[in-house]
C-alpha cells in the first residue's frame, strides 16, 4: 500500500526527469523534438501490448532520459557537424555507461528506466554498444527502443534529407524489416511496422517532427504532458 507521501514522491521523481531533460535540451537543441517522438513511439508500442499504469509511466521516464549520459560528452564532440573520428565515437559510445551511472547516483532502481538508459544501442547480432550483447541478453524494452531510435534517426527532419513524412517512413520501415533478426528484434519490428502501416504513428511522425513548433519536453509539466500524449 502506498503511504501518505507517495503522491509527493511521484511529483519529485517527475521533477527530476524534467530537470534532467531540460539540461539535455540546453546542451543539444535537436534533442527536444527527438525526445517527444521516442517517448510517444514507445508508449504506442507498449499500450498496444496492454501495458498500463506505473510500468507505462516508468517507460515514459526511461525514454525521456535515454540520452542523459550525453550531459557528460564534451559539446565540441556532441555538436560536431562533420564526421566523428574513431576516438570521438568511442567517447559518444560511453553515454550509455555514464547515463546509467547518473541514474544509480540518483538511487533509481527501476529496471525499465535503467535498461533503457544502459542498453538502448545494443543490437541483436552483438554489433551494438557498449557491451555487444546478443539476442535475448538485451532486455525487451531496449530491443523495442532500438527499433524506435533507428526509425526516428531515419525520419527526423534534416537539412540534407529530401524524404520526409511517409516517404521517409516507408523507407525506414523497409530497412527495419530487412534488418529483422540480425539487427533488430523481430517481434519489436513487426509490432512497430503494424502500428505504422495502420496509421497509428502518423501524428507523431508529422506534428512532432517540427522541433521549432514544440516546447521542450522538459519544460512541460505533468498535466500538460498527459494531455499531449493522449492526442
Residue locations for each model-derived region?
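Metal-dependent catalytic cores of enzymes that make or break cyclic nucleotides
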Residues: 7, 11-231
